[in-house]
UniProtKB/Swiss-Prot annotation:
InterPro entries to which the protein is assigned, alphabetical: Hist_DNA-bd (IPR000119), Histone-like_DNA-bd_CS (IPR020816), IHF-like_DNA-bd_dom_sf (IPR010992), IHF_alpha (IPR005684)
Signal peptide: none
Organism in which the protein naturally occurs: Bordetella parapertussis (strain 12822 / ATCC BAA-587 / NCTC 13253)
Lineage: Bacteria, Pseudomonadati, Pseudomonadota, Betaproteobacteria, Burkholderiales
Protein name: Integration host factor subunit alpha
Subunit structure: Heterodimer of an alpha and a beta chain.
Gene encoding the protein: ihfA
Pfam families, per database record: Bac_DNA_binding
Length: 113
């Protein structure tokens, strides 16, 4: 193990996104919260319908149907069926990948326009 200490990564929450809209765009706090909530509700609803969601410069969310398959109980070795299910996948855009690859300085919010 190295002696380099890395900062604990932060988690950006919906409440913090609303606060950022309040600070940067000038919306009141209620409007900012409503916009963030509506944004994520629309994404959730589209995915629930089986639609894809494409956010230019960010990435694509898609729903995939996974077929049933045999699995194995790791304790007993017994074969058990794993049911079919739907999963959400995310593929980052090239733009997002290139920003994430260079974590030394946060991106300038003005350059995202």
């Amino acid at each position: 193990m190295g002696t380099t200490m890395l900062a604990e990564p932060r988690t950006l929450t919906k409440a913090e996104l609303a606060e950022l809209l309040f600070e940067r765009v000038g919306l009141n706090k209620r409007e900012a919260k409503d916009i963030v909530d509506t944004f994520f509700e629309e994404i959730r609803d589209a995915l629930a319908r089986g639609d894809s969601v494409k956010l230019s410069g960010f990435g694509n969310f898609q729903v995939r149907d996974k077929p049933p398959r045999p699995g194995r109980n790791p304790k007993t070795g017994e074969t058990i069926p794993i049911a079919a299910r739907r999963v959400v996948t995310f593929h980052a855009s090239q733009k997002l990948k290139s920003v994430v690859e260079q974590p030394s300085s946060p991106p300038d919010p003005a350059s995202a326009e």
